[in-house]
Amino acid sequence: MAGNETIETFLDGLASSAPTPGGGGAAAISGAMGAALVSMVCNLTIGKKKYVEVEADLKQVLEKSEGLRRTLTGMIADDVEAFDAVMGAYGLPKNTDEEKAARAAKIQEALKTATDVPLACCRVCREVIDLAEIVAEKGNLNVISDAGVAVLSAYAGLRSAALNVYVNAKGLDDRAFAEERLKELEGLLAEAGALNERIYETVKSKVN
């Protein structure tokens, strides 16, 4: 989302026939909502006498979650830029052998970026999940369900962005590059999946 774009405007764009914003932007905003909910739990815990012992920890979490929220929000534009670069590369002329070679090189360059951008989103969503675990354990019990929604939102963002990694990595000729990214992605998914289940159960036990 642009700096002053409303959520309604973003969703109108998402629903339109325009190719961007698309799933990559939705993944980033899902992660950003997770980070925002982590911040919410922190803000509703800090300053409460009952939670004075964890206040210092949650102030640190809050600083990190706000940084991650800004990063993820910025990734919406990164996704659009990466998509546009791929489409632009495919649109290059291919009338001569030289043009074909230049076009192929540009496509591969753009696909590498289009693989790395959603992978970066996955990494940041993974960080949000770590912070969600902290607030699920230490946060104000009155808003502990929001910690659960935080982890679910971040996990959804990670898994959603992962689909774009798969799509773009598939088209790469540099298989070593692709396999390196896919290996990292599988690790992120495995770690986040286990954490997602654990944190959800932690939150559920506190609200029941």
Swiss-Prot record:
One of its GO terms (biological process) is one-carbon metabolic process. It comes from the Bacteria. It is a single-pass membrane protein. Its EC number is 3.5.4.9. Its main location: membrane. Gene3D superfamilies: Formiminotetrahydrofolate cyclodeaminase monomer, up-and-down helical bundle. It is found in: Membrane. The keyword Transmembrane applies. Disruption phenotype: Mutants are unable to grow on either methanol or ethylamine in the presence of glycolate. Glyoxylate restores growth, but only on C2 compounds. The chain crosses the membrane at residues 25-46. It catalyses: (6R)-5,10-methenyltetrahydrofolate + H2O = (6R)-10-formyltetrahydrofolate + H(+). Keywords: Hydrolase, Membrane, One-carbon metabolism, Transmembrane, Transmembrane helix. GO terms for cellular component: membrane. One of its GO terms (molecular function) is methenyltetrahydrofolate cyclohydrolase activity. InterPro entries: Cyclodeamin/CycHdrlase, Formintransfe-cycloase-like_sf, MthfCyhylase. Pathway: One-carbon metabolism; formaldehyde assimilation via serine pathway. Belongs to the cyclodeaminase/cyclohydrolase family. Homodimer. Required for both C1 and C2 metabolism. This is Methenyltetrahydrofolate cyclohydrolase. The gene is fchA.
